[in-house]
């Protein structure tokens, strides 16, 4: 395969792929690299990029906004984190591959960079943003004061791990016949219900009944990380909580990754291709990244690329000054994430969504006013995007008068007969 040619060595068992299964799967279908498949794919592809003489990597840069003329994209304004200057990257074709927006929530499995930057920029440029209410909450993020955003892979449950309460009692049989292998939304809601009903800080995932040598070999990364925190997963259950994990919505694209803005493409989690529906099945995200990246490249290569650019105005920073109140940015960052977790989380209601909308409207105005007055920083850029994305998520959630997939509203607990997309466009 292309990935194997790039150096990804999938785990083998007797000369064949060691396939595993995860939530929502009916059979073993996932090729993996122990318990760090994503890391292996990313590391090897990055090594390939670094060897290419015709590719230049610009590290420590952060996109601010897309360069749009009419309905055509010509690149982006980009913030240099070292010089603190904004420069223009002009291009014939622009591809967004910026990931999702799970950092909108207080608890997430994602890194700090998952602030929905690409989706927010695309929205401001006039792109269709689709189905942003479908945020997937992964059921099992490690719960520990010294662990940040560490995911306990779904493959543990695929290999037989059980979810238990602090007293050791199993509970998934109360929610779904598929038990721990029910889809993520079902498992996350079950855990959330048990925690809120009983006042627990977390539940536990137990695989300690398996052979310890097998556990260490099959899950070396999880075993090591938990061990550094004093948790021996071979003899003790793992404390876990649900956390925001994946953005199923995003920039609407066709099968070639083209958005409704000419020369602007989106691939990976930033995009809404439609393949995940209202609830992504485990491990399909890596497949989507590879398939649509290749489709995007083919589409660009078969079309002619011109050599004429419009005149791009330089970034104007003459009317702003350095801020002496960065505490405002820090405070609003935390406030947005708490609002999203408390009012727009795993279980929603119209009252909570309207309350979130009201609060976010005020914060959005405050951030935009701040943005117009002061010199931009990377934190301010990400806060601006975070607030914009949070508003879009709430607006999308309020527009859906049903419960479907990852969106569960207590006021509309049933699913409508006919599926539809929620589409948000800048007015």
Label the model's feature ranges:
Residues 2-85, 90-93, 97, 141-144, ...:
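Conserved redox-cofactor binding core of oxidoreductases
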Residues 96-108:
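Flavin (primarily FAD) binding-site architecture
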Residues 110-123, 129:
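Thiamine diphosphate
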Residues 2, 8-28, 164-180, 191-194, ...:
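Glycine- and aromatic-enriched mobile tails/lids
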Residues 121, 127-238, 290, 299-305:
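An anion/pyrophosphate-binding glycine-rich loop and adjacent beta-alpha core
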Residues 65-83, 88, 231-275, 281:
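FAD-site-proximal beta/loop scaffold in flavoenzymes
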Residues 36, 86, 105-113, 147-151, ...:
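Alpha-helix capping and helix-loop boundary segments enriched in small/acidic/polar residues
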Residues 94, 121, 256:
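Hydrophobic/aromatic ligand-binding patch that stacks against planar heteroaromatic rings
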